Amino acid sequence: MAGHNKWSKVKHIKAKEDAKKSKIFTKHVRAIMTAARQGGGNPDTNAALRLAVERAKADSMPMQNIQRAIDKATGNLDGVTLSEVSYEGYGPGGVAIMVECLTDNKNRTVAEIRHAFKKAGGSLGTSGSVAWMFEKKGIVVVNRSDKDDEVMETAIESGAEDIKELNEVLVIETAPEDFNNVLEAVNNIDGIEILESNVQLVATNESEVDDETAEKVEKLIEVLEELDDVQNVIHNMA
């Protein structure tokens, strides 16, 4: 009996580890697909894709999974036709939320997203209802280190618009057209770690909410991010 209990515990731990790995792989797939859609499927000429692939490999993601994500994003997967579509709405507390998707069935996708908003006490809006609160920016997130000054100087010289110095990371913001130049320049600095790099929507003004509402919004974002068709969820919660 003790042996059975021990095996049950091992299976439970393995299941948790598998779920964790699956979540990590899903995150990598989304990053790879976003980069490939934005800059093409060749890592040699697409710095964001090259970094996304390197991060996936570092987490032991199989190369066939990586290539499938690239092929899916660039329309090179037989029998699969994907469309980019964005949905927008209000979460708890009136927080504006944008949901970027890649789907082969818009009816299924919008039904799943509408259900998630409704269950959270929010509402899916019409096109343009919250999009005006966001703008496209290139974002490069770098781990802080003794190279911070060099990173910031290089980023500014190569076209960065703004740099936020947070506790553990530097967040570099660029115009979309300057993103690749800035990313390439920063990535050439030895001994730094780029955690995230893509062109994404950024809130132009933030919405303040209390802790209880913030928890509800975070739960909605988590539910949305678990949907297969969802690529990115962007909000304006402070």
Curated annotation (Swiss-Prot):
It is found in: Cytoplasm. GO terms for biological process: regulation of DNA-templated transcription. Pfam families: TACO1_YebC_N, Transcrip_reg. GO terms for cellular component: cytosol. Keywords: Cytoplasm, DNA-binding, Transcription, Transcription regulation. Its main location: cytoplasm. InterPro entries: Integrase-like_N, TACO1_YebC-like_2nd/3rd_dom, TACO1_YebC_N, Transcrip_reg_TACO1-like, Transcrip_reg_TACO1-like_dom3, YebC-like. The keyword S-adenosyl-L-methionine does not apply. GO terms for molecular function: DNA binding. The keyword Transcription applies. SUPFAM superfamilies: YebC-like. It comes from the Bacteria. Belongs to the TACO1 family. NCBIfam families: PRK00110.1, PRK12378.1, YebC/PmpR family DNA-binding transcriptional regulator. This is Probable transcriptional regulatory protein NAMH_0626. It comes from Nautilia profundicola (strain ATCC BAA-1463 / DSM 18972 / AmH). The lineage of its organism: Bacteria, Pseudomonadati, Campylobacterota, Epsilonproteobacteria, Nautiliales.
